[in-house]
């Protein structure tokens, strides 16, 4: 049986410690692919980028961690991964691990 393909993203950015911890944990059970925002994108909800071009760059860190950093939102990352980057749809999509509380639904504008 083949290992599941796991797409990992977050809202804290590809350099956040939580995404690396999640990548390490998911490496035990599947083949994780990290595609996350290049910079912190907290509190953007389901936003997507409509007017600016999305840029994707390869990121390599110590310990074998590698992924793609996208100049957009977490939703952009998932969408571009599934529609343009991956050869096949992932078996699982995970977002996290968050640096702080997930309070998006508690914010009143």
Q: For the regions a protein language model found, what residue spans apply to each?
A:
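A cross-family phosphate/adenosyl-ligand binding-site feature
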Residues: 2-6, 20-85, 89
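Short beta-strand segments
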Residues: 9, 35-37, 95-98
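Conserved short-loop catalytic and cofactor-binding motifs
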Residues: 10, 66, 104
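Short glycine-rich anion-binding loops that position phosphate/pyrophosphate groups of nucleotides
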Residues: 12, 40, 73, 98-101
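Short acidic, Gly/Ser-rich segments with clustered Asp/Glu that frequently serve as metal-coordination loops
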Residues: 12-20
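Short, Asp-centered acidic motifs that coordinate Mg2+ and/or phosphate
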Residues: 92
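Glycine/threonine-rich flexible loop motifs
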Residues: 101-109
